[in-house]
Amino acid sequence: MSTNTKFIYHRILLKISGEVLQGVNKFGIDINSLKRIVKEIKLVLQFGIQVGLVIGSGNLFRGATLSQLGVNRIVSDHIGILSTIINSLAMKDIMNSYSIPSYVMSSIPVDGICETYNYERAIDLLSNNFVVIFAAGTGNPLFTTDSAACLRGIEIKSDIILKGTKVDGVYSKDPKKYSQAVFYKRLTYKDVIQKELKVMDLSAFSLARDHNLPIRVFNINKPKSLYRIVKGYDEGTLIK
């Protein structure tokens, strides 16, 4: 394996939104999207970068959306939590097909399917070059997978949270709706709060801020974007 001395990050926590997995579909998992992401991850693994992964559930069921439709919010969030396990298992299976050693750890017990999360075990797996996929969010309703990503990032002592989305970074407004939206290359934690930018929910963002954990938001669909970030290129938006 090649040395990673020329890379600025040694251990990363990659957060991928569920919407990224659905690709061109309106619902579900697009296998081609999964394969593309796995190839991006495999590229950085070849240089010794350790990768923890959290996947959202928006391609299947989002708790907040179900709640708006009349489903009890706690039940809605439980459905979202289970959906992250589905996404995580699909990701692991594609990783297996690319000969990438990976492990799914769930915040809730799912005996016979995946191991229950333990941070010491997770760090040991990462140190042995396994991709650790953290499923089931925080294990509790009312918390997003962004909160789970920041929490796991802190626990495993990751160097940075990399939030892979379908846009190039953080904008003043939704760039798909507003052509005049301003793109931000760098922001402070204070900037994000003052400008009320939708980077993450406040609980997740506060976790990262309080532990001085930098966040970079980038377009995971851009080829080699993940590689460029760990190499030190100024891809997307950096928040610190």
Curated annotation (Swiss-Prot):
The keyword Kinase applies. Inhibited by UTP. This is Uridylate kinase. Catalyzes the reversible phosphorylation of UMP to UDP. GO terms for biological process: 'de novo' CTP biosynthetic process; UDP biosynthetic process. GO terms for molecular function: ATP binding; UMP kinase activity. The lineage of its organism: Bacteria, Pseudomonadati, Pseudomonadota, Gammaproteobacteria, Enterobacterales. The gene is pyrH. It catalyses: UMP + ATP = UDP + ADP. It comes from the Bacteria. Pathway: Pyrimidine metabolism; CTP biosynthesis via de novo pathway; UDP from UMP (UMPK route): step 1/1. SUPFAM superfamilies: Carbamate kinase-like (SSF53633). Homohexamer. InterPro entries: AceGlu_kinase-like_sf, Asp/Glu/Uridylate_kinase, Uridylate_kinase, Uridylate_kinase_bac. One of its GO terms (cellular component) is cytosol. Belongs to the UMP kinase family. PANTHER family: URIDYLATE KINASE, URIDYLATE KINASE PUMPKIN, CHLOROPLASTIC. Its EC number is 2.7.4.22. ATP binds at K15, I16, S17, G18, G58, R62, T165, Y171, D174.
